[in-house]
Amino acid sequence: NRTVDRVARSNYTQIFGPHAVNMSGTELVISKYGVKAEWPYQLAKRVKEVAISIEQALVYGKVQEDTSGEVRTMGGLIDFITTNVNSSSTTITEALWLDQMQAVFSAGGSVDRILVGAKQKRVISAFTAGLTVNVNLSDRKRGQVVEVLQSDFGQTSILLDRWLRVSDVFGFSRDQAEVKTLRPLQVEPLAKTGDSVKAQVLAEKTLQFERQSHSFRFSALT
């Protein structure tokens, strides 16, 4: 049967932050060794904290409704990918990897992104050495390196992510996952009180993930 009933999936937006920055008038004008200007330096640190929180939530976020005593949180890849989950294998092999690729192909999909941490990247590199067709150095950003592999199921980009657990590997297609923004990452000035300047850094985003049966993950690797 090629007809598949549509299933409505939902997600919540999550507020990342607000992270406050508060500096006195004295701190604003004095010089500090190694820092040209303290205020933009502190703002940049908070922006980076929010960006890292977003990256982590896109993978490991768990859906939580905004109720009394609970903070509304978004679901990440780990919440959406539920069909092709290998929760028994402790070592990823070429055969297991291709089995997952084939399962997605048989379901009508294709995988062109595999998200891995440092240890599993080395394991995959060992058995895919002959499949490497390109290394895109321009995509190195916040610890990510892109390596394109060729297999029976097409080209797949291996994305190295420093925030992934050793146990996990995720496979999906780039047209399945999209980051949706309700409020972009921003710096909001706060009311000045006394001899100080204040601001907060925040963003509000969520993950839209479609056709989860066209993706896979390993969850018990060591």
Residue positions per predicted region:
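Flexible, glycine/threonine- and acidic-rich loop/arm segments that mediate assembly and lattice contacts
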Residues: 1-222
